[in-house]
């Protein structure tokens, strides 16, 4: 009876995947773990604080900050889907993940990645409307339009996750079940399949092109028009204000699209599994740390709102 149960448990365990993690081959695993944990806490605190500020401060109830709060929410979810499992696994020594857990991780990762790409396009259109169409801005970017744009971003991201996750998880994995990543990422998982996935890889590549092409067109068109208007401005102060309004967003666009292009569109023969893991760590851990810093330190409205909130809290304590 016990023997039968043990066999059943071994068979069940054999279906689990093993995540390599960031610390597997490192000689300074403890130091790397500490740095990752601190970055995780910084990202959680920074994005949560940014969301709290935007929703509690009436002066920040504008379309631009509404989109920034959604970006911060996506970054928070990104972190919570991928990083805690890796950190806990390093402490407990259990780096395994079940197929269902792997599928859930992959679905949320694809959903959030897709939604964030479209959200950046919506933010670029918002900047175009603010800089190039200031008189029509209240009409073009009213509350209903902003809510519809954000809802569309989430829906399109979910479509991406619902399309790719079931197909990826349906492939047989009869070779090593060791995923060379710290979370269940589609390219890393496909390398474990013992069936021919060349057609699916091509379809995934085309899907990525479609997912990235529309946002890239919107973003590039918006900023081309903005730069054209800035070039025609006579006022140096007006130029600086317009550039400051858009520069923060452009930094985030370059970071995310660069990482997405590298991971999903560059041929796998041009990069190693270790390089893939570093890029994944960059846009999963480092970018959520940078986003609040970029949008707060470079933004007088946010810093003013933060000082106001801290002063009100101090007055309440007195």
Swiss-Prot record:
GO terms for biological process: detection of chemical stimulus involved in sensory perception of smell. Disulfide bonds join 102-194. The chain crosses the membrane at residues 31-54, 63-84, 106-125, 145-163, 201-224, 242-264, 278-297. It is a multi-pass membrane protein. CDD domains: 7tmA_OR2T-like (cd15421). InterPro entries: GPCR_Rhodpsn (IPR000276), GPCR_Rhodpsn_7TM (IPR017452), Olfact_rcpt (IPR000725). Its main location: membrane. Pfam families: 7tm_4. It is found in: Cell membrane. Glycans are attached at residues 5, 10. One of its GO terms (molecular function) is G protein-coupled receptor activity. Residues 1-30, 85-105, 164-200, 265-277 are extracellular. Keywords: Cell membrane, Disulfide bond, G-protein coupled receptor, Glycoprotein, Membrane, Olfaction, Receptor, Sensory transduction, Transducer, Transmembrane, Transmembrane helix. GO terms for cellular component: plasma membrane. Odorant receptor. Belongs to the G-protein coupled receptor 1 family. This is Olfactory receptor 2T34.
């Amino acid at each position: 009876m016990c023997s039968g149960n043990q066999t059943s448990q071994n068979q069940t365990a054999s279906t689990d995947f093993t995540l390599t993690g960031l610390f597997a081959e490192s000689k300074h695993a403890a130091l790397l773990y500490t740095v990752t944990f601190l970055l995780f806490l910084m990202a959680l605190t920074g994005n949560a604080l940014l969301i709290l500020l935007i929703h509690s401060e009436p002066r920040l109830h504008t379309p631009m900050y509404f989109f920034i709060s959604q970006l911060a929410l996506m970054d928070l979810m990104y972190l919570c889907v991928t990083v805690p499992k890796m950190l806990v696994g390093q402490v407990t020594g259990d780096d395994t993940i079940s197929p269902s857990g792997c599928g859930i991780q992959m679905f949320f990762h694809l959903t959030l990645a897709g939604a964030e790409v479209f959200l950046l396009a919506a933010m670029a259109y918002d900047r175009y409307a603010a800089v190039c169409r200031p008189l029509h801005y209240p009409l073009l970017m009213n509350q209903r339009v902003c809510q519809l744009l954000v809802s569309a971003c989430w829906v399109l991201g979910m479509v991406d996750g619902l399309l790719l996750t079931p197909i990826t998880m349906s492939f047989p994995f009869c070779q090593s079940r060791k995923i060379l990543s710290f979370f269940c990422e589609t390219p890393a998982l496909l390398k474990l399949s013992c069936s021919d996935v060349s057609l699916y890889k091509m379809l995934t590549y085309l899907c990525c092109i479609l997912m990235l092409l529309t946002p890239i067109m919107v973003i590039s068109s918006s900023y081309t028009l903005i730069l054209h208007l800035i070039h025609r401005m006579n006022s140096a102060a007006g130029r600086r204000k317009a550039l400051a309004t858009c520069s923060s967003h452009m930094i985030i666009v370059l970071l995310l699209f660069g990482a997405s292009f590298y991971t999903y569109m560059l041929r796998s023969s041009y990069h190693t599994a270790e390089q893939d893991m570093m890029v994944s760590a960059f846009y999963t851990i480092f970018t959520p740390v940078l986003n609040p810093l970029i949008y707060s330190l470079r933004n007088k409205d946010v810093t003013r709102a933060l000082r106001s909130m801290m002063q009100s809290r101090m007055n309440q304590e007195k």
